[in-house]
Curated annotation (Swiss-Prot):
Pfam families: ACT_AHAS_ss, ALS_ss_C. This is Acetolactate synthase small subunit. GO terms for biological process: isoleucine biosynthetic process; L-valine biosynthetic process. InterPro entries: Acetalactate_synth_ssu, Acetolactate_synth/TF_NikR_C, Acetolactate_synth_ssu_C, ACT-like_dom_sf, ACT_dom, AHAS_ACT, AHAS_small-like_ACT.
């Protein structure tokens, strides 16, 4: 089952490596990971998406709490929360599909952020399901040259 962990940790050298090492040592895969400083520059917020049963995730949480750099671990996927991901993709364009690509991007509330004579670079934010649906549809209208995704960021509501 998909799980999203939000980890507050010290913004220090080696902190990221220790968290990733813990997952690696236990044989757990990290599906996505994001990390950035918080409003307090001494702290960072890490969001990890992984897959595991409740017992495995509980064990990971216990092990994370033992790391000296980790201040708080919250499983945000089980409560009411907001999650987003950003995708940038470069698509091949031709004259008879330009309007279709623009229209699909607008329907998904995305943006065209760069235009050349042969390509568009599109930007879209939303849930993973929304981004997956967009990619599936856009493939019907254009060749996707390159895709880069940010990974999930999330926050609990309330």
């Amino acid at each position: 089952m998909r799980r999203i962990l939000s980890i507050l940790l010290e913004n220090e050298s080696g902190a990221l490596s220790r968290v990733i090492g813990l997952f690696s040592q236990r044989g757990y895969n990290i599906e996505t990971i994001t990390l950035a400083p918080t409003e307090d520059p001494t702290l960072s917020k890490m969001t990890i998406q992984t897959v595991g049963n409740e017992k495995a995730i509980e064990q990971i949480e216990k092990q994370l709490h033992k790391l000296i750099d980790v201040l708080r671990v919250v499983q945000i996927g089980q409560s009411s929360h907001i999650e987003r991901e950003i995708v940038l993709l470069k698509v091949q364009i031709n004259n008879h599909r330009r309007d279709d690509i623009k229209h699909i991007t607008e329907v998904f509330r995305g943006q065209i952020v760069d235009i050349t004579s042969a390509t568009y670079i599109l930007q879209l934010s939303g849930t993973t399901k929304k981004i997956d649906a967009f990619l599936k549809i856009i493939r019907n209208f254009s060749e996707i040259i390159e895709v880069t995704r940010s990974g999930i960021v999330g926050i609990s509501r309330g």
